[in-house]
Amino acid sequence: MTVAIAAFTPDRLPAMADRWVEAWAKAYPAIDFAARRAWFCDRITALAESGATVLLATDGEEVAGFVTVDPATGWIDQMLVGLAHQGQGVAAMLMETAKRLRPAGLTLDVNADNARAIAFYRRQGFATTGQRLNDQGRAIALMAWRSPPPAERPRS
């Protein structure tokens, strides 16, 4: 496996949607994510058109994962790694790239019952800053990462 970070191009949207549907369907099998595929495609297109940075993790020609970052606010609207690439460092690679893009800080929300994602974000230095309910009444954790302050230089 050789994963690289690449810029979003519209021709990759179907593969991104495939990864999104398969991962979310596994996490929440009672929800029909295939029926939400068009929403996802519209969402990614709107984010890209509004100035968000959309980055892909690619393994050869395959889309392994993706992250979106609003460079003005640091908001991560979408982050996902496909099932075949989970647990292989792809998410960490995407997050490190997002941190370099927005060293002032990043924010995101995550389903509060998604223990695996929350543990990943905590390992990446994110802290829980609050909680809210989404439109379906599901608890959502709000999380933020701030770049550590520069180390002080020794005084001479």
Segments predicted by a language model, with ranges:
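Acetyl-CoA-dependent GNAT
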Residues: A7-A84, M95-T97, L101, N134
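Short hydrophobic/aromatic beta-strand or adjacent loop that forms the aromatic wall/cage
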Residues: A52, G137-M143
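Active-site beta-strand termini and strand-to-loop segments that position acidic
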Residues: T58-G60, A144-P148
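Active-site acidic-Proline motif in GNAT/NAT acetyltransferases
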Residues: G82-A84, Q88, A112-D113
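Conserved GNAT acetyl-CoA-binding A-motif
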Residues: L101-D113
